[in-house]
Amino acid sequence: MEITAQMVKELRESTGAGMMDCKKALSEADGDMQKAVDILREKGLGQAAKKADRLASEGLVSVEVCEHCKRATISEINSETDFVARNPQFQALTKDTTAHIQAKGITSVEELNESTLNGVKFEEYFKTQIATIGENLVVRRFETISADEKGVVNGYVHSNGRVGVLIGAACQSEEVAQKAAEFIRNLCMHAAAMKPTVISYKDLEKDFVEKEFIALKAELEKENEELKRLGKPLHHIPRFASRSQITPEILAGVENEIKEELKAEGKPEKIWDKIIPGKIERFYADNTILDQRLTLLGQFYVMDDKKTIEQVLAEKSKELGGKIEIVKYVRFELGEGLEKKVDDFAAEVAAQIG
């Protein structure tokens, strides 16, 4: 198996062993990362390699926003335990690191390690912090978003430091951008709580929507079986799950269906124009459940659950005198995608007593 530079880099970062030692171990293990860790340990290169068993999946998410809301940075720095995450020194480390990343315009962990903080190479500074705090610490990821003179960015990190969000908006004017900063922060708070994965239904892949629609219908049908058994009202089974599935032709057909219903009900044609928009809105609400779950603009606003973020955004644009469009969205949740290590206490004691 070909041993790539990326594989060597990952093994080196997880074990702290030398680059050539990592390359040799990977070659001997035929590319198997865990076997390579074991080989390093067996060869006496494993003091640092033992760090790989000390999974850093706790820690903090940190957010730094510049004074004029033109630049914002989010980072996740992991520790092994929640106890250390509450340590003031670790909290200061995350804050200082995030501010440093933003100030220097750093875009990668490699660039971060080579940078200088307080007159010391960051890699050395960070190792000193690990030694002082006494746990394996990892700068897992970070991202910075920026705005021009007509844009605005803002951020929010939940008080427990486990969730952080950045949102960037393009505005019609610099004046609108300045006025919109607090509103954008409120949207960040919404996203922290409601967990949208993308900005708009337009960002959802077609295959993903179709797959999720099948799962959604199965979920609702299963729930309906229980509701029917209990004699309760059943869920409506939607015809669609996302606005991405509702073409202009489909919408025209729905409007014709509504007109036929109104005609059958004997409603005068002169009032149809007042009724149809509300029914169309209801149709969208019933048939965009996936958007409501996964897209920022499609979700109902936590501060006004009668309106979607898209509707609130339109109202705020009108209020501030210029269009506001969400163009950037980043959400970090602590440890997402990491497997947390579950310690076997009995096995640990047995190992220590031989």
Swiss-Prot record:
Instruction: Give the UniProt subcellular location, in the record's own words.
Output: Cytoplasm
User: What residue ranges carry the coiled-coil annotation?
Assistant: none
Query: Mind telling me which Gene3D superfamilies this protein's record contains?
Result: 1.10.286.20, DNA helicase RuvA subunit, C-terminal domain, Elongation factor Ts, dimerisation domain
Top-level taxon of origin? Bacteria
The regions listed as transmembrane in this protein's record are none
Single GO MF annotation = translation elongation factor activity
Q: Where is this region: Involved in Mg(2+) ion dislocation from EF-Tu?
A: 81-84
> Where is it predominantly found?
cytoplasm
The terms describing its cellular component in GO are: cytoplasm
Keyword terms of this UniProt record = Cytoplasm, Elongation factor, Protein biosynthesis
Entry's InterPro entries? EF-Ts_dimer_sf (IPR036402), Transl_elong_EFTs/EF1B (IPR001816), Transl_elong_EFTs/EF1B_dimer (IPR014039), Transl_elong_Ts_CS (IPR018101), UBA-like_sf (IPR009060)
SUPFAM superfamilies listed in its UniProt record: Elongation factor Ts (EF-Ts), dimerisation domain, UBA-like
Q: Per its UniProt record, what NCBIfam families does this chain match? A: tsf (TIGR00116)
Q: What does this protein do?
A: Associates with the EF-Tu.GDP complex and induces the exchange of GDP to GTP. It remains bound to the aminoacyl-tRNA.EF-Tu.GTP complex up to the GTP hydrolysis stage on the ribosome.
Q: Which family does it belong to?
A: Belongs to the EF-Ts family.
* PANTHER family documented for this protein: ELONGATION FACTOR TS, ELONGATION FACTOR TS, MITOCHONDRIAL
- Kindly provide the name given to this protein in its UniProt entry: Elongation factor Ts
List the gene name: tsf
